[in-house]
Every structure is written in structure tokens, then in C-alpha cells.
Design a protein with these regions (language model features):
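Non-heme di-metal
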Residues: 1-218
């Protein structure tokens, strides 16, 4: 499993997750996997909800794209639950994700702004998940988990790009980029406020990325 994290330099995040976070959450792999399973379930549900929010003929292939994302996320859910159950874990009936919930509160009401924000928030969650999976893969001494999280990086990166490119087709590129940077800044602030614990989007001391300013992700 490659430990080179230079691929993360291309991500547009406004903060970077330290390796110490990964080492801490990997100390309780069963609870981490449980949280991850719910993350994949919500990601699949989000894609299915967006499927019926097709914004019109200007975005052909919308339904096919969203069904593809939902299919991928459901496959990830199956993978993570298999690992979880094999290790003696189970899925709780109730699960809270204050990180994602806080991001979704930033979505403006009323289309087209609402659907644009939903795409950008989805992209922000995917790109942070992408980063976290890469850090987990690099930090894990568990060969199965390291390989699992390394393999997820490419898929989550693809989903992030899908959501971002769809958003860029919905409105003036400059307006989309401005909103994207606003949401990325908010994402970093929201993540920094999260409590520590064995969760994919748990909090830690996140160093800001100062060199060169925020990246556009494009």
C-alpha cells in the first residue's frame, strides 16, 4: 500500500488532516467501521434524492450519473458492513452525523440555488472523505483496512469531481467558484468544531493550508 500522500496536494480543502487523527481513530476500528457504514448509506440516499431533482435539459445524463453514484455508494456500504460484521460489530438503529448535518444547513432554499448548493455540499463531503480515506490507508497497520481505504480513494475522488462538474454547468462559473470557496471554508470550520472520536468526520486539530491560498479544485 503506497504511503505517499502527495496526491492530497491537488485537493481543494482549506485544512489538512494530520496523521495523528488517523492513528487515534484506528485504535477503535469497529466503531470507525460502524460510522463509515452509515456514511456510505447516507451517500447512497443523497444520490437517490438528487436523482429526482433533475434541473432540466441543460444537464443531460443526470439520472444516469446519480444512479451510478448511488450504485457505487451501495457497493461501498456492502463492503464496509462485511468487514464490520466479520469483526464482531453491528449497525446501530440510530446514528448522528453533526458534521454533515451542519454542512447541509448551509444549503439555500429554492431552486436553482438549492440544487447548486446540494451539489457543492455533496462535493465538499466527498473530497473530505477522500482525504480521510487516504490518511487512514497511510496510517493503518491493519493490512485489510489499509487496502480497503486506499481503494476507496479513487472512487470518492471521482464522486467529488462528478458533483463539482455538475455544479459548474448550472450557473456562471465565477459565481459557482465563489460559492464553492465559501462552502470549503465553512467545511474546514465545521470539521474543526467536531468532537474527537472514531468517526470518519470527527474533529482534530486541523492545520490550515496557507501556502498559495485555497485551491479551486479544478
Amino acid at each position: 500500500m503506497p504511503s505517499d500522500l502527495t496526491k492530497l496536494d491537488a485537493l481543494p480543502l482549506h485544512s489538512r488532516t494530520p496523521m495523528e487523527w488517523a492513528r487515534a481513530v484506528l485504535a477503535d476500528p469497529v466503531r470507525l467501521l460502524m460510522d463509515h457504514a452509515f456514511l456510505e448509506k447516507k451517500a447512497a440516499t443523497n444520490a437517490l434524492e438528487l436523482l429526482t431533482r433533475w434541473p432540466g435539459d441543460g444537464l443531460p445524463g443526470w439520472v444516469e450519473t446519480m444512479t451510478g453514484v448511488a450504485r457505487d455508494e451501495t457497493a461501498h456500504l456492502a463492503q464496509v458492513t462485511r468487514i464490520l460484521l466479520r469483526r464482531g460489530g453491528r449497525l446501530d438503529r440510530i446514528h448522528k452525523n453533526p458534521y454533515a448535518n451542519s454542512l447541509r444547513l448551509l444549503v439555500r432554499k429554492g431552486d436553482p440555488a438549492e440544487i447548486l448548493d446540494r451539489l457543492l455540499v455533496s462535493a465538499a463531503i466527498e473530497v473530505r472523505s477522500c482525504e480521510r480515506f487516504a490518511v487512514l490507508a497511510a496510517a493503518s497497520a491493519d493490512a485489510e483496512l489499509a487496502a480497503f481505504y486506499e481503494a476507496l480513494f479513487a472512487s470518492e475522488f471521482g464522486h467529488y469531481r462528478v458533483f463539482l462538474e455538475l455544479a459548474r454547468k448550472m450557473a456562471d462559473p465565477a459565481a459557482v467558484e465563489s460559492r464553492w470557496q465559501q462552502l470549503l471554508a465553512s467545511e474546514a470550520e465545521i470539521l474543526a468544531r467536531q468532537e474527537a472520536g472514531p468517526r470518519i468526520h470527527s474533529g482534530c486539530l486541523l492545520p490550515p493550508l496557507h501556502s498559495g491560498g485555497p485551491r479551486s479544485g479544478g
